[in-house]
Amino acid sequence: MNSDDIFFYAAKIFGYFLRIDNLVFVAVAIAIALFWRKRTVLAKRLTIAIAITLFLFSNVGLSFSALRTLENQYPIPSIACDDGYEGVIVLGGGINPGLIAEERNQPQLNDAGDRTTKALELLNKCSNYKVLYSTFSGSLRPEGMSESDSARLFFQEQGIPESRTIFENESRNTFENAKFSAKFAEPGKKWILVTSASHMPRAMTTFKRFGWDVIAYPVDFRAESLGKYLSWSRGQGIENWNMFIHETLGSLMYLLRNSDA
């Protein structure tokens, strides 16, 4: 097991336990155990803390405010086909890999599918562009069709010739996206980097760290500009916070990691 493997597995494990919904589940289990052990005072305090946590993190407006600090860091650029870009780098996450894609032989776009459709839009707009689709699987136990192979099928179905497509089929995270994609790109070429807006700060930092000349093209925005501070949703609010925490801690971990890891 090399340093890339250690980093990948550690990030997956920490990421799982730092999700708010998982932390609340653990806290509820502890509260039940405390009640069962007759430690009612401590159990009641923990129950109140759980209720306050759910109340705050379920607030949609607060989650939007947090997420906008990531999504607003890079504006949507104006792209001209003669600006000297080699093409579009798409970071995986917009197509579901797995057994369904393999069994149905059909790419399964998900709620981050804007990454893939924006790349297609730019390819159709600029006939001189190529697409470099970078991903294998972020799963601990990948099975079925990889996302890269699903993306290959998607672009084939959309009529994009193979001469304009490049597929990096090893990476499991953003660090490896930047590291492994360098095998397919000529030094000094300019690229357009497409990924979700909340993911873009970490992606840009990582790609520039590996010497890439990229411009950010954020997609898949989740945070509205309207307040919605009187709106609560455990699904939307907590999931937005999970995304914010994941990206913020991910950026911190990448900063702490040696560039030659």
Q: What residues fall within each predicted segment?
A:
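Extracytoplasmic/luminal low-complexity segments enriched in Pro/Gly and acidic/polar residues
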Residues: 220, 226-232, 241-261
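Hydrophobic membrane-insertion alpha-helices, especially the h-region
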Residues: 45-60
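Structural signal for membrane-spanning alpha-helices in multi-pass inner-membrane proteins
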Residues: 32-35, 58, 254
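Hydrophobic alpha-helical segments of integral membrane proteins
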Residues: 6-14, 62, 66-70, 245-252
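Membrane-embedded alpha-helical segments of integral membrane proteins
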Residues: 1-36
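Membrane-interface helix-boundary motifs at transmembrane edges
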Residues: 35-44
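A structural signal for short, hydrophobic/glycine-enriched beta-strand patches
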Residues: 56-237
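Transmembrane helix-loop junctions in multipass membrane proteins, especially transporters and channels
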Residues: 40, 72-76, 258-259
